[in-house]
Each structure stands twice: as structure tokens, then as C-alpha cells.
Amino acid sequence: MKANRDFGRDGGPFSITPNRFQPKSSGNPIFRQKTIRTVGIIALTLVLFLFFHRSFFSSFGEFPSFSSTANAPNSDVQEYDLRKVMNAKFTGDYSPKEKVLICAPLRNAAEHLNMFFGHMNNLTYPHELIDLAFLISDTDDNTLEVLKQHLDAIQNDEDESKHFNNVLIMLKDFGAIFGQEFSDRHGFAAQGPRRKLMARARNWLLSAAIQPYHSWVYWRDVDVETAPNTILEDLMRHDKDIIVPNVYRPLPDWLGNEQPYDLNSWAESETALQLADTLGEDDVIVEGYAEYATWRPHLAYLRDPNGDPSVEMPLDGIGGVSIMSKAKVHLEGCEFPAFSFEKHAETEGFGKMAKRMGFSVYGLPHYVIWHIYEPSDDDKRIMAEMERERKEREAAELEEAKKYQTAGFTQPDDQGAEEGPLAHADDHVD
């Protein structure tokens, strides 16, 4: 049949002749053996070269180093024992070399940086164990330039013990619409949105700066006027997950000399819990305002000037002027809520969240640091009124002096005789 012819094995268009594959001649066997031996030697040489020269790979970005030690030079693999971080505890001994991350959010802070770096320069905790991190946001002054000047001076100080381990500067705007005047920052209407925005800034700063080797995180406002040089050690010694000092501010004599500044450190009250139940989902309770009467015990109002500075008070909410936190608190996911968490945000929400997660939160009612004095609008009105009264009083005194001068000093009469109440003061009767 033609089918066999067309598709069979008898020479048709699809036939294969011969029917069995015949390999080409194998050639000279001696030549083939030499070739195999040469290729083998080249391959072995290449393997040995790569084995003894691992750095060959490191010159190419796509080839990672094979080193697994944290301290190996030029290593891309780093190893950290987080058990040390989780068990951070300061007992006065610096030998464990527990590193501290100091975080400072900045906004139009140029005028305060000289004071801030004066404090940083005098810290007694070893500077080689301290990292500094700054986030500059929504700023229209020369904060960045002034910051760099101070950092350049301190990091190039002849005394190397003044040098900090590492410094990080970040710039990120958040669209802040609130001014930096005292009343702008502390007005009731601004508190909820402002706290949420500040929480975002803190979280950006924290997440970008914290490292696996940090044992502690210390938050510090740059406008603190007075604080002990030993503040890091003082707060660490209490061995709390989160701890804050009391914060006051000085006042002019006519305002009473001093005043509690940070009312955001408090213990919860039943009244406040009931108030929270009446608020909307996004509402935020803020302290120190008549609109929210919480009747909470405030750390600031429990201060005794002669009290023991080591006395501790358990807290639920905390202020943000000065916070010492173990790094594990942040590493386990506790940050600053930029939303209403149990009707609180930012640092107060941070305290609430930490308590919910089982961390210890404390304050020191008799251990005080001092914030700068910034006059509020009410203070400015009082000062303006006092200035007006002072000028009126001076004008009245000047007018009275003129009247006294007119009445008290004598004037000569037409004949040269003195007239007036002093004219005959020296007369005497024989």
C-alpha cells in the first residue's frame, strides 16, 4: 500500500534510512583523554580559587558574602542576641554596654538647640553608648543648619569622650497647620488633631532610628531648661518598662514662681472612664481643660519639694517631655497611636497601649525637670495690663513729684527776700 511507502521505513518522505542511529566516529582516543584531563585541571583550579578567595564574590552586588559572623570585616551578615535587649537592666555598671537611642522631634527649634546640646554634652552616661536621632518637620526657620553646626562641634571635639556613637537626621513634613506659639500648641481645639499628627512624627522617627542593638529609648523635648546630667541613669535604675519624671516650669514672681507643666502623666479615674464611654469613636481626651473634667490624679500635683525623688507612682497616661522606655516595648509593637486608642492619642495613648500589653508604666512625682517658661495669651494680657498700670503709676508719681517741687522749693520775691515754706526755716528766737 502507498501508505507504507509514504510513512513507512522503505524510503518514503518520512522514512529514516538506515533505521538505527549511527554515531559519528569517536576520533583519536588518546586526544580525547588529554582533552578531558585538561578540562578537569581547569575546573579544579577554578574551584580552589573561588574557595580560597571568597572576596571575589563580594565585589559583585549580586553575590553575597558567605560570612556569618557579626564582627567580620566587610560582612553583610549581622547577628544580634535580642535576649540581651529583652533583659535590659541598669544597675550602675556600664560594662554590659547597653546602648541608648535618644529621640528628639524638632519643629522650629533653632533657638533651643544651644540649650539642648548643653544638656547632651553634659550627660554622664558614656557617649559612645548613645545614638542621637532627630526628625525635623514642618519647619520654616534654620533648625537644620543650626543642628548641623552643633553636631559638627560636638562630634569633632578634641575630647573624644564627648563624641556620640551615631547621629541620624531626618526631614519629613506632616502638613501641620498649628502655630508654635504657646496658645497655638495648647489651645483646646487643636489638641486632638495635633496629638495625632505628633504621634505620626514620633512613629516615623522611631521606626527609622531604632536598631536591634538598642536597649533603651529616651524621648526628650529640646526646650527643657533644667535637668540632672544623670537623668539617663536615674530613670534606668528604676527598672521599669516606661518611666517619666515630673515636669514643672518656672513663672515670673507675679504669677507664683512655678507651675506644673506636664499634665499628661496621670492615673486613670472612674470619672474619666465614664466620660470616654460618652465620646465619639475618633474623639481624644486631653487633660487640663474644663471641657474634659476627668478628676484623675496627676503626677504633677503630687509633688513635694522635699519628697524622696525615688518614690514611684503607677501611671496610665504619660507626657512626652521626657520618656525613658526599654527598647523591647517598641520592638514588641507598642508605639504612639495616631488615632483614638481608648479615647487617647500620642504619648497618653502610648501609656494606655503599653498597659494593655502588660508593660509597667510609672512616674516619679518628686523627681523634677524644668521646662522653659513660655507666656500664654492670658499671661501676655496680664503682663500688658501690669505694664499699663506701671506706666500710669510712674506718670502719677512724676506728677506728684512736680507738685512737691513747686510747693517745696522757695522762689525769690521782688526784693530778693525768700518766700515759701522754707523761707524762715533758720529763724530763731533769742
From Swiss-Prot:
Glycans are attached at N122. The chain crosses the membrane at residues 38-57. Residues 387-403 have a biased composition (Basic and acidic residues). GO terms for molecular function: mannosyltransferase activity. It is a single-pass type II membrane protein. Residues 58-430 are lumenal. GO terms for biological process: cell wall mannoprotein biosynthetic process; protein N-linked glycosylation; protein N-linked glycosylation via asparagine. One of its GO terms (cellular component) is endoplasmic reticulum membrane. It holds the Pfam family Anp1. InterPro entries: Mannan_Polymerase_Subunit (IPR052086), Nucleotide-diphossugar_trans (IPR029044). It is found in: Endoplasmic reticulum membrane; Golgi apparatus membrane. Residues 1-28, 387-430 are annotated as: Disordered. Residues 16-28 have a biased composition (Polar residues). Keywords: Endoplasmic reticulum, Glycoprotein, Golgi apparatus, Membrane, Signal-anchor, Transmembrane, Transmembrane helix. The keyword Ribosomal protein does not apply. Residues 1-37 are cytoplasmic. The M-Pol II complex possesses alpha-1,6-mannosyltransferase activity and is probably involved in the elongation of the mannan backbone of N-linked glycans on cell wall and periplasmic proteins. Belongs to the ANP1/MMN9/VAN1 family. Component of the M-Pol II complex. This is Mannan polymerase II complex anp1 subunit. It comes from Schizosaccharomyces pombe (strain 972 / ATCC 24843) (Fission yeast). The gene is anp1.
